[in-house]
């Protein structure tokens, strides 16, 4: 008996394609382009970082070399190098790189907020005097009360005499040192 044309398809080995676990996920060409563009922007952010900041980001040697080369290149060559960096990033897990970059950006924002708080505290020290000194001593018990009072007194004299705020800057520096030594 000869097989019918439909019957010969049933005997093909590996004919268990109907497995529902192997779903094919279709990704649009536009989405692929958006992802590539996003990785190119990430690469540009990495190129804009300084050497010290780059040291804090987990990069392998060839990606690091490509970034350092892009930092030295100007104009059209830089654009092509950024495209290469984007291509290299597509072949890697970029999540650790993104997390390290976010951490760097967040650290900068936290530092700006801290500086604003210290400036406000410095201004209160100059205006309020001993009441604000007590607050500083509760925040940082190891602070030198005598040095603070001397700096405050000098800052008030400079302010009254319309002189440059040298002592006010010194108060800020001292408060910043206290905050850095604490953390």
UniProtKB/Swiss-Prot annotation:
This is Dual-action ribosomal maturation protein DarP. The gene is darP. Keywords: Cytoplasm, Ribosome biogenesis, RNA-binding, rRNA-binding. GO terms for cellular component: cytosol. The keyword Cytoplasm applies. Belongs to the DarP family. The lineage of its organism: Bacteria, Pseudomonadati, Pseudomonadota, Gammaproteobacteria, Enterobacterales. The keyword Cytoplasm applies. Member of a network of 50S ribosomal subunit biogenesis factors which assembles along the 30S-50S interface, preventing incorrect 23S rRNA structures from forming. Promotes peptidyl transferase center (PTC) maturation.
């Amino acid at each position: 008996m000869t097989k019918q044309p439909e019957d010969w398809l049933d005997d093909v080995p590996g004919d268990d394609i109907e497995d529902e676990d192997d779903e094919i996920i279709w990704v649009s060409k536009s989405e692929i382009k958006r992802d590539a563009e996003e990785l190119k922007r990430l690469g540009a952010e990495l190129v804009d970082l300084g050497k010290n900041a780059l040291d804090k980001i987990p990069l392998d040697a060839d990606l690091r070399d490509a970034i350092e080369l892009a930092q030295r290149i100007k104009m059209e060559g830089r654009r092509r190098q950024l495209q290469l960096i984007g291509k290299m990033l597509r072949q890697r897990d970029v999540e650790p790189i993104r997390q390290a970059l976010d951490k760097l950006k967040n650290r900068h924002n936290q530092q700006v907020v801290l500086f604003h708080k210290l400036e406000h505290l410095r201004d209160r020290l100059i205006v309020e005097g001993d009441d604000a000194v007590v607050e500083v001593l509760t925040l940082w018990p190891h602070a030198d009360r005598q040095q603070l009072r001397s700096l405050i007194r000098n800052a008030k004299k400079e302010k009254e005499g319309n002189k440059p705020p040298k002592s006010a800057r010194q108060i800020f520096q001292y408060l910043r040192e206290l905050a850095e030594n604490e953390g």
